[in-house]
């Protein structure tokens, strides 16, 4: 359930009071606090930013860059609020330069990460593509995640998914982007087996979906989200 963004959360926005490795809940993995909503969540589901030496806000989608992190929920409305109401500057304790195309940079970065994961799965034999092969994996119980290109045929998508009602579905923007991960001009349908790579893909896909605000008719209840 999404938290409503209120004035107090924005006014109080600052870098998490906890050090990057100290903010925990009930002894579990570290959590991070969104500078806008003030909600805490697992870091892999959020967006991390750092401020470069020349005070430029820099996305850190892998959460590996040095420096104190600024954390944001991966939602389009939260990003817009942070940009327009000074939350980034407050969290950074000073003025920062925000790239004008920050949303595009984030979306492109997440798509790139998803396609890199597909590439890893391909080399490990954990992913296949094409209508017939995906249906074969579904029928054989090998598919753990279905990947669909948003610009594919809705009718073909419906036929494919009719046999995969219990499987999560992740949507990527274009068949060209998905195809590139397989060394093809375009790929509309793919399936990934259960495992860490599928989980990693789903995490990035959930972040991408939250930022892009895209919805595909008929797939509203088939999200690959991890919740």
Regions found by a protein language model. Give the residues of each.
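Short active-site oxyanion
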Residues: 68-69, 124-125, 142-145, 164-168, ...
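Short basic, glycine-rich beta-strand/loop surfaces that mediate nucleic-acid
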Residues: 165-209
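Extended interfacial segments that mediate partner engagement and assembly in macromolecular machines
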Residues: 76-151
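Positively charged, polar, low-complexity stretches
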Residues: 122, 131-132, 155-171
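Helical mechanochemical/support elements of P-loop NTPase systems and associated helical scaffolds
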Residues: 30, 69, 84, 110, ...
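Charged phosphate-binding loop/patch that engages nucleotide di/tri-phosphates or the phosphate backbone
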Residues: 203-227
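Conserved nucleotide-binding/hydrolysis micro-motifs of P-loop NTPases
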Residues: 41, 77-79, 151-154, 176-177, ...
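N-terminal cysteine/histidine-rich coordination modules
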Residues: 1-85, 90
């Amino acid at each position: 359930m999404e938290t409503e963004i209120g004035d107090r959360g924005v006014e109080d926005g600052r870098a998490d009071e906890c050090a990057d490795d100290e903010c925990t809940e009930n002894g579990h993995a570290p959590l991070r606090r969104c500078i806008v909503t003030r909600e805490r969540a697992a870091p892999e589901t959020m967006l991390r930013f750092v401020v470069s030496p020349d005070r430029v806000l820099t996305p850190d989608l892998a959460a590996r860059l040095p420096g104190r992190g600024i954390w944001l929920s991966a939602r389009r409305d939260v990003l817009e609020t942070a940009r327009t109401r000074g939350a980034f500057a407050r969290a950074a304790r000073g003025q920062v330069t925000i790239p004008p195309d920050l949303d595009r940079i984030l979306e492109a970065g997440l798509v790139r990460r998803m396609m890199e994961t597909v590439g890893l799965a391909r080399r490990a034999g954990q992913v296949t593509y094409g209508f017939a092969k995906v249906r074969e994996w579904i029928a054989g119980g090998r598919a753990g995640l279905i990947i669909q290109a948003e610009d594919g045929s809705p009718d073909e998508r419906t036929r494919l998914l009719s046999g995969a009602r219990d499987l999560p579905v992740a949507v990527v923007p274009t068949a060209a982007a998905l195809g590139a991960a397989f060394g093809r001009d375009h790929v509309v349908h793919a399936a990934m087996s259960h495992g860490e790579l599928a989980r990693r893909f789903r995490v990035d896909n959930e972040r991408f979906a939250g930022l892009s605000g895209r919805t595909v008719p008929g797939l509203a209840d088939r999200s690959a989200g991890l919740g």
